[in-house]
């Protein structure tokens, strides 16, 4: 996505292309059978930002938690304003929640929250630059 483009996708509209783009920006590795829920890329602002919600299989949770952000990131809850504007963003309803924030090069940041929602494992990601 380039500066000036905003893109919102829900469920099946989200393809491997968007998941791979999030991986490229954040360094997060997602399981092959990740089920997308919501994706929003804000490119029209001064600083780009992105939010993503996916579901992963419960037996893949421990493997997902091996991503660098969970080993080296700070324990911090995400409160990015564009995330809160998405109807599918229900991070405050999670149980067994793990929150991390990690600074990337060039004043970019990634936040990731993993937890249970109605007994299923969901991953919430925010990425932004300042």
What are these regions (language model features)?
Residues 68-130:
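Extracytoplasmic electrostatic interaction patches
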Residues 22, 48, 106-108:
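Residues that act as N-cap/strand-start positions at coil-to-secondary-structure junctions
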Residues 1-42:
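N-terminal leader/targeting segments
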Residues 29-33, 37-94:
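Mature extracytoplasmic domains of secretory-pathway proteins
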């Amino acid at each position: 996505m380039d500066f000036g483009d905003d893109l919102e996708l829900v469920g099946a509209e989200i393809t491997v292309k968007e998941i791979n783009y999030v991986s490229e920006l954040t360094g997060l590795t997602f399981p092959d059978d990740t089920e997308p829920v919501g994706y929003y890329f804000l490119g029209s602002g001064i600083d780009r930002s992105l939010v993503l919600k996916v579901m992963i299989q419960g037996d893949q949770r421990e493997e997902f938690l091996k991503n660098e952000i969970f080993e080296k990131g700070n324990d911090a809850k995400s409160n990015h304003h564009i995330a809160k504007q998405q109807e599918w963003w229900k991070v405050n309803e999670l149980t067994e929640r793990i929150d991390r924030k990690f600074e990337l090069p060039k004043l970019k940041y990634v936040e990731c929250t993993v937890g249970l929602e109605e007994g299923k494992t969901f991953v919430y990601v925010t990425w932004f630059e300042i």
